[in-house]
Amino acid sequence: MAPAAGPRTGKHAKPQRSKTLKRKRGQEELSSLIQRVEDLDLKGIFKSFSDLPLSEPTASGLASSHYKTLTDIQSRAISHALKGRDILGAAKTGSGKTLAFLVPVLENLYRKQWAEHDGLGALILSPTRELAIQIFEVLRKIGRYHTFSAGLVIGGKSLKEEQERLGRMNILVCTPGRMLQHLDQTALFDTYNLQMLVLDEADRILDLGFQQTVDAIIGHLPKERQTLLFSATQTKKVSDLARLSLQDPEYVAVHETASSATPSKLQQHYVITPLPQKLDILWSFIRSNLKSKTMVFLSSGKQVRFVYESFRHLQPGIPLMHLHGRQKQGGRLDIVTRFSQSKHCVLFSTDVAARGLDFPAVDWVIQLDCPEDADTYIHRVGRTARYEREGRAVLFLDPSEEEGMLKRLEQKKVPIEKINIKANKQQSIKDQLQNMCFKDPELKYLGQKAFISYVKSVYIQKDKEIFKLKELKLDEFAASLGLPGAPRIKFIKGDDTKQRKNAPRAAAHLLSDDDDTDEEDGEKKSKKKEEPQVRTKYDRMFERRNQDVLAEHYSKLINDDGTMVAPNAGAGADADEDDDFLSVKRRFDAGDKDLGSSGDEDDESEKGNKKNVKVRREKLLKSKKKLLKFKGKGTKLVYDDEGNPHELYELEDEEQFKARGDAKDQQAKFLAEEAERTRLADMEDKEIAKQKRREKKEKRKARERELLAEAEEEETLVQLPPYEGDQDDEAPRPSKKPKVKFTEANDREEAEPWYKKSKKSSDQAAHTPRQIQTLEDLESLATGLLG
């Protein structure tokens, strides 16, 4: 008899009970955490992470990473972010803004019990790859005890590998370009359930360089989300904030009332350096600071490469590195790692390393080229003096850049002092650079590209109060780079563009109307330039010269009408008509109607026509388009329902207009109606466009899913072995074929040709089944075969 059903006993009972208790305890802790967050006082003062209502995994991750004390931006921003509010965070460089948005990301997803099947929960955008890698490493440290899946999506890596894993990610740290590529191309990647959007260095991401990309990314995201914006120079433009659909954002600026926008322990200086002496002073500075860690910022990648290669050949006695956007991702990451770990080193870099990167113990920040604005200056000098450490920064300014740049820095509350360089400390490397460029053509070519890129970077700057290209000594600067002469630059010319544009018009007005032949020739030349005709082989044949020896000499001896010029005549002499018996007086075209008229009358009429009718007038009469400007404008009539004609734009009667009310009221009413109509039409158009994009994306993703499903089905096809269930009932097959004794007929078959043999054998095979009709026939056949 079977035992009665009852509660499980034994070794399996205790683990099940412990799992139930653990799940119940987790639910109680989660509800308690949610209640603590709701009761959080936003006006309170928080000094450590333990004062905040954080979950156990986040608190353990912060403690393991040795984060205990809160900075100003962290204490104010984290509390608002935990409440689910949108934030505009602004703080000085090196003040801990990364933790200010990573902690709320982990906490908000933890309280919502986010899992893998819930999809993407948080998206963190960074302007550069290096900053994205740094954010991802911090996220891995503090989130090590969470169960979320986090991913890093940047350019320079395999797109297919990212596509395979992207659908399982809960948190993504990415750059805008690669993120948009996945949103457009990856079929299994959806963002409809996104909870948080974070923009680090928000002013740079919302700048014109990323504007179209960021707008496209935001178009894929849901509007119901929490948005966090952080930067050292935060944007307050209404247009930028409207693009992000922020809902009552909290502006957290902890250093807005501070005396300076840069760290207090940062010593800032500037040096007036003429453009041709910049490399000499930079070389002298590096030689005198061999036991320090220095970052040198330049305006373009080609300048970085040239300065790095030339200084590397000169061997200053300190390790040199260079970083720019044209390098491959593996090399860039290796350079960032090596520079972070080194104690004494010089890094030449573009603005790719100007924002957000945390290099430990940087002593000097040198800005060899003037930054484009004060915000860029603040971010550059922020690579040193981080987390209350000391640091020094030096800005190299040309005399033409001093006044404008100092005015911009003063507006941003940047304290900076002027210093002078001792003349006996300077070392000139001009001759050495010339020698290297003479010996190495590649270095010379790189120097030319560096010169052009620098001039172009100055030319495209918007602030012309700072960047005055015409006041720069470009020839001397080219010589200081070791070049034999200044390279030609296409966009720099002596005349202004407007003057060049208006020059042909001014020249055309000066021409008199009597010079019809000159104008006609000029028009013909311009037409030839504008519309090049196709030249056939016959045209080329008749345009050939020197077809015989006397061709050029003979052309000098004849006039245009074919008559000969006297040998002893001057240059302006007429043809010698006495040499020929008959001479041509006048030529007529074939089929001319005026052949019967007298010659004198024709000559007089031709002269009169030439005086009265001009070439331009003839062309004007032949062109309908040119005659339209002398005609009046046409009128268009519109008929009402009763059949009465009205003008297309008919003015209303004054009495009817006054009867409808005051003019200002009518104007306000009309503007309100039109604004409402355009607003509704705009909303409808946007919704239609969005729906079309979504349908197109869904069709593409469905197609990709079908292709993936077909590929998986093809891969999973397996050939099963034959069913062996009925083989036991059957007789076992013989292991060997029975021996057959060939008769004389078989011998005859072997002797016959192959084509007869095959036909005969096929005939036998066809007739054999018909002869076997009874069991006796089968036995006789078997005995015959067995012999």
Swiss-Prot record:
Binding annotation for ATP: A91, K92, T93, G94, S95, G96, K97, T98
Ranges for region Disordered: 1-28, 494-542, 560-579, 586-618, 653-776
Signal peptide: none
Motif (Q motif): 47-75
Classification via Gene3D superfamilies: P-loop containing nucleotide triphosphate hydrolases (3.40.50.300)
Alphabetized InterPro entries for the sequence: DEAD/DEAH_box_helicase_dom (IPR011545), Helicase_ATP-bd (IPR014001), Helicase_C-like (IPR001650), P-loop_NTPase (IPR027417), RNA-helicase_DEAD-box_CS (IPR000629), RNA_helicase_DEAD_Q_motif (IPR014014), SPB4-like_CTE (IPR025313)
Written domain comment of the UniProt record: The Q motif is unique to and characteristic of the DEAD box family of RNA helicases and controls ATP binding and hydrolysis.
A GO BP annotation: rRNA processing
Motif placement: DEAD box: 200-203
EC number(s) reported in the record: 3.6.4.13
Name under which the protein is recorded: ATP-dependent RNA helicase dbp4
Subunit structure: Interacts with the U3 and U14 snoRNAs. Associates with pre-ribosomal complexes.
Task of the protein: ATP-dependent RNA helicase required for ribosome biogenesis. Involved in the release of U14 snoRNA in pre-ribosomal complexes. Required for pre-rRNA cleavage at site A2.
Family: Belongs to the DEAD box helicase family. DDX10/DBP4 subfamily.
Keywords tagged on the record: ATP-binding, Helicase, Hydrolase, Nucleotide-binding, Nucleus, Ribosome biogenesis, RNA-binding, rRNA processing
Bias type Basic and acidic residues, positions: 522-542, 586-595, 656-690, 741-755
Major subcellular location class: nucleus
Sequence ranges assigned to domain Helicase C-terminal in this UniProt record: 278-437
Single GO cellular component term: nucleolus
Keyword ATP-binding on entry: yes
Domain Helicase ATP-binding, residue spans: 78-252
One GO MF term attached to the UniProt entry: identical protein binding
Encoding gene, per UniProt annotation: dbp4
Top-level lineage group: Eukaryota
